[in-house]
Amino acid sequence: MTRFDTIERAVADIAAGKAVVVVDDEDRENEGDLIFAAEKATPELVAFMIRYTSGYICVPLTGEDCDRLGLPPMYATNQDKHGTAYTVSVDAREGITTGISAADRATTMRLLADADAKADDLTRPGHVVPLRAKDGGVLRRPGHTEAAVDLARMAGLRPAGVICEIVSQKDEGHMARTEELRVFADDHDLALISIADMIAWRRKHEKQVVRVAEARIPTAHGAFTAVGYQSIYDDVEHVALVRGDIGDGEDVLVRVHSECLTGDVFGSLRCDCGPQLDAALEMVDQEGRGVVLYMRGHEGRGIGLMHKLQAYQLQDSGRDTVDANLDLGLPADARDYGTGAQILVDLGIRSMRLLTNNPAKRVGLDGYGLTITERVPMPLRANAENLRYLRTKRDRMGHDLVGLDDLDLGETAQ
């Protein structure tokens, strides 16, 4: 098992102007990035980064700083697999030559970190690629972009970092993985940390959602306590329906349900969301204890209601649910489970049995101090309208849906 250094050491090194190595989840990019604070950029640091990485150096910034510096997205609708928010590339307007040397790029990096810098201080395009970090950092998105901004902020510096992926010295056609990164860090006296450890550290020291209200809600599936939350960073409101004693230390049956107006409210047969919500409430009721967490802002797998309706139009023309999103220039799945994980932790849940057919949901909740002891499958709710949709989720999105091949489009299976 790889040995990681403490977050405290990494923060101290960042504050001192050193680089650190940061590893993300093996089910995500499974890569290690060299990271240092942008305001501490020197020709020597940049040259070191260029030597051992892919050389595609980026500078993560807060959304506020991106707006202040006039840094729009590189492309209007982000299609990156992991949602990396690239902006237009830039160079410093003054103090550089061609912009590509280590010294020139260091100048541009320091300028991007300067609180007094203005949009006119930069030229576009250039040789440095700023990235727009999500508000809330690694607690909202467990990526290197957010890790860099968080580390700089935690070190008491301007929230701007410099990142690049470390290349394997054993196989230069691929990226270095965790064990090799440990050796690399030791050889160069660098701290090696994981984003999962950063999340745990921030969760221990910071709070990103607030509990607003709670009330008894009698339903057709029994009485629940509705606990309302609001996200600090985007003001989106979420509701956890709680049944029974969930703080007794035993595994809790949990369903994290994505908002679906068409399925949950209108009873649309194009998806299985409404039946899944009903089934989750019924299963928690039968269990006598558990949580159904209703996540707002997840409409259409995170693309929003209007875009979902547009995707439906494309599906009526023959696209499947994945290609319809992609044809609109949108991700196949844009949902973020970080806020949901924080809510579950606030409710006192540490160990749970997760109600889902979607393995990606488990990955989205891992790293937040939550232990998932079992994935409990949801009942299959297929019909003539959603059978193709369900098969696409199985074949192209990895959902664990059994028995679909025994059905045809003219059948309805409950």
Swiss-Prot record:
Where in this protein does the record put region DHBP synthase?
1-204
GO biological process annotation, one example: riboflavin biosynthetic process
Q: In which pathway does it act?
A: Cofactor biosynthesis; riboflavin biosynthesis; 2-hydroxy-3-oxobutyl phosphate from D-ribulose 5-phosphate: step 1/1; Cofactor biosynthesis; riboflavin biosynthesis; 5-amino-6-(D-ribitylamino)uracil from GTP: step 1/4
Which cellular component terms (GO) are annotated to the entry? cytosol
The EC number(s) this enzyme carries: 4.1.99.12, 3.5.4.25
Domain of life of the organism encoding this protein: Bacteria
* Keywords on record: GTP-binding, Hydrolase, Lyase, Magnesium, Manganese, Metal-binding, Multifunctional enzyme, Nucleotide-binding, Riboflavin biosynthesis, Zinc
Cofactor(s) needed = Mg(2+); Mn(2+); Zn(2+)
> HAMAP family under this entry?
RibA (MF_00179), RibB (MF_00180), RibBA (MF_01283)
Q: Please identify the protein, giving its name as recorded.
A: Riboflavin biosynthesis protein RibBA
